[in-house]
């Protein structure tokens, strides 16, 4: 029975991402009508309405690459990356989907693509 102390090495600070991944699944719709001003997002790791309610009011962003580079205000280098910002308004259904409204409507080419759900503003 040797009492050897195990030397613990301090772990490196882990830098995680500050957003939750979501998939743009479509627009809010009825049987024959579609509302392009409201998008439906399926959040990764969220499976019920109560968990989806936590994300109400959080900011969302759709990042995409454009054809031409432009210089944004406050930056010194031109980039092709563009962003469309929005906000989660409420849960949708019972399976963890949410509704989001964007400042400019999301293009249909974004169906099935990634959306970032930022964890601010925080309500905890």
Swiss-Prot record:
Gene Ontology BP, a term: cytoplasmic translation
Positions carrying N-acetylalanine: 2
Coiled-coil boundaries: none
Pfam families tied to this protein: Ribosomal_L35Ae (PF01247)
GO MF entries: structural constituent of ribosome
InterPro entries xrefs: Ribosomal_eL33, Ribosomal_eL33_CS, Ribosomal_eL33_sf, Transl_B-barrel_sf
Taxonomic superkingdom: Eukaryota
Gene3D superfamilies attached to this UniProt entry: translation elongation factor selb, chain A, domain 4 (2.40.10.190)
Keyword Transcription regulation: no
Family according to the record: Belongs to the eukaryotic ribosomal protein eL33 family.
Protein name: Large ribosomal subunit protein eL33
Source organism of this protein record: Caenorhabditis elegans
